Amino acid sequence: MGIRTVAVYSDVDFRSLHVEASDEAVHIGPPAAADSYLCKEKLIEAALSRGCQAIHPGYGFLSENHEFARMVVQAGLVFIGPSAEAIAQLGDKIAAKALAISVGAPVVPGHHQSLSGVEEAVATAEKIGYPLLLKPASGGGGRGMRIVYSQSEIEDAFTSSQTETTKAFADNRMFMERYIPRPRHIEIQIMADKHGNVVHFPERECSIQRRYQKIVEESPSLAINEPIRRTMGELACRLARKAGYTGAGTVEFITDENKNFYFLEMNTRLQVEHPVSEMVTSLDLVEWQLRIAAGEPLPLMQSEINAHGWAMEARICAEDPRRGFLPTVGMITRYATPRGKGVRVDSGVRAGSVVTIYYDSLLAKVITHGENREEARERLVQSLNGFHLEGLITNVDFVNAVVNHRHFVAGDISTNFVEENFPNGQPVDEPALEKHHYMAIAAILIYHVRKGLVVESLKPMAAKIGRRPPAPTATEYVLKGEGCLFNVRLEGDQASRTWKIAVDDTSYYVETPEFEFYRRRLKLKINGRYQMFRSRYQEQHIQIFFCGLI
């Protein structure tokens, strides 16, 4: 679009990709976000010092901060987003519920007014019935939310929820509504210009979450039919018009197991998962944001926005699923992203990047597109298999396991999916014996070939002309896995790359590629079908992760 950009950076981000990609960059302060990226005055000062005309708030906290939006406009700059008034109204969940009701949107039954204290909370809970959900009027990300199953829990839940909310958002207002078991999370992307035009895009499903934060998204959704899809889109546009909204926004709904849907909230910004919508429409939503902010009308009307195919996105985060998804830190020592038809990677890091304690754990997004859901899913699996990151623990293998899970493949998902199928970050379903055998084969081959290379390197050099190659011999191993032992008998050699391997009493015929140990990825052809594995060397152990059929 020919727009020059100015980036801001903190002390620890002076070598970041966003700094390198911008035309200019301004140092904004120390690592702590409150003293740099969230400091409103410093951001505005940086913009004015470089002669900027507008500020794009990204999709962080300031993108939904009405005070910041107001300060930007007062400084004579354009805020690329809705007005401060719209942000204030829709950012208040109680006010947003009232607005949604006024345009005819269904809401979850409950008490959509601020609770005065514990006594009112107890009395109101009796009227609504259990289980119920306590929610803060401000904020997001699941902070302050509590599921309450009985009267004995309500007092402690209200007190702890209000305390957390006050600390996080400086707002102690709480409300409550009926808890919807196993809901699905559906959202509608809207765009509104300054001329009264509003359009909606195909829905996105964001039901795969951990700690109320999304990790896998897709569009369209299997959860809704065409009439519901159309109604959701119309209600989202109606809500935006009522609020005098401009720019990009997302209206969120939940559906219950009977396919009833309810308004949840509206996010007054562009979502992290917006590439999913871009992949199914071939439209650039950030470009739309910029054109709207410049006063242009919407590039397309509703009838001109068409969806094709299916898209999925997986968020790659620096976190440890086995430790409650705690953030991890460190330097990225190896980094390679997948490529291919229908594959897009939005990344903020590279080899040498240092992941610190100061910012969000999101490192990259892998987005795939296919003619149908299964093709998009298969491309996502292949892309995750080809996503290579070392130096710190990430959730790559976890999200790969999620999209390979039989319930995900079948579309049987809800916001409880991770909790039900991956408690403590590990699958409930025990892998089939065949998969255990596959992992045993991968581990033994890695060990056997590495050992053979070492032995060969220690032999004296000798002419091989006129000598017959030695006949392949069988080698037997006992492999110790997690809580089990495998007797493995291996015949073959790396020269032919073909092996006959018996795991306990089951035989497999295996073809191997040229081993490239530095890649940590291994593709084996087992009984005629390709399987993908990832390896990790830890002290005297080889860890094998099964990444699925390819």
Describe each PLM feature range:
Residues 505-531:
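A conserved acidic, glycine/proline-rich C-terminal tail/linker
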Residues 6, 27, 56, 133, ...:
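Structured core elements
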Residues 236, 275-506, 513:
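Catalytic cores of soluble metabolic enzymes centered on carboxylation/carboxyl-transfer
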Residues 54, 64-71, 323, 526-550:
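Structured, non-catalytic alpha/beta "coupling" segments that mediate domain-domain communication
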Residues 1-251, 255-274:
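N-terminal beta-alpha lobe that positions the nucleotide/phosphoryl donor
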